[in-house]
């Protein structure tokens, strides 16, 4: 049975013709008892799937992911079973609510009870188009993992753009080695 991720990936691959990579796919567990595994693992809802560009050069692979409005401390990157995973959480900025609360605290007096009630009213957003919550993006490196030197992984996060660079292993095709027979 196809999951929603399989369907989205097939649509994405048809539109972008990038069959080597996928957005995010549930990894199957090797554990035979899936019910216990389901209960023990903390499963997070994915609210955001960030945009990603992958560039392969002669010397390295460059992965650029848009993570605007996300703190560096809320981003987690790892590679497991040849899958690069970028995940974390985009939190709501509560500065406006805090400013409103500080303003209402300053205006409180004993003889102004109606004013206190007015200041306790919640504000209402006029327009809200931004997304908040958990994000996750996976990249299958299986087809090129043998070419990569994972000890050279570097990441840089600036102006909402996460750039991960992995150098390729030095080219051994031009070198010749003599192999001794024992």
From Swiss-Prot:
Protein name: Small heat shock protein hspG1
Keyword Acyltransferase in record: no
Domain sHSP, residue spans: 43-182
Gene3D superfamilies linked: 2.60.40.790
Positions in coiled-coil regions: none
PROSITE patterns assigned: SHSP
InterPro entries linked: A-crystallin/Hsp20_dom (IPR002068), HSP20-like_chaperone (IPR008978), HspG1-11-like (IPR051779)
Family, similarity comment: Belongs to the small heat shock protein (HSP20) family.
Gene source species: Dictyostelium discoideum (Social amoeba)
Signal keyword on record: no
Recorded name of the encoding gene: hspG1
Keyword terms: Stress response
């Amino acid at each position: 049975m196809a999951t929603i991720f399989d369907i989205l990936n097939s649509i994405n691959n048809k539109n972008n013709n990038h069959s080597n990579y996928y957005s995010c796919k549930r990894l199957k567990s090797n554990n035979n008892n899936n019910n216990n595994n389901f209960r023990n693992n903390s499963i997070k809802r994915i609210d955001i799937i960030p945009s990603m560009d992958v560039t392969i050069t002669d010397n390295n692979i460059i992965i650029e992911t848009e993570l605007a409005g996300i703190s560096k401390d809320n981003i987690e990157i790892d590679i497991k079973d040849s899958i690069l995973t970028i995940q974390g959480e985009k939190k709501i900025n509560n500065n406006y609510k805090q400013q409103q609360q500080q303003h209402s605290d300053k205006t409180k007096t004993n003889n102004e009870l109606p004013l206190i009630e007015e200041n306790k009213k919640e504000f209402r957003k006029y327009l809200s188009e931004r997304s908040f919550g958990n994000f996750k993006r996976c990249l299958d490196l299986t087809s090129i993992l043998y070419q990569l030197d994972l000890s050279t992984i570097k990441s840089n996060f600036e102006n909402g753009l996460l750039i991960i660079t992995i150098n390729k292993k030095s080219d051994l095709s031009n070198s010749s080695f003599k192999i001794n027979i024992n």
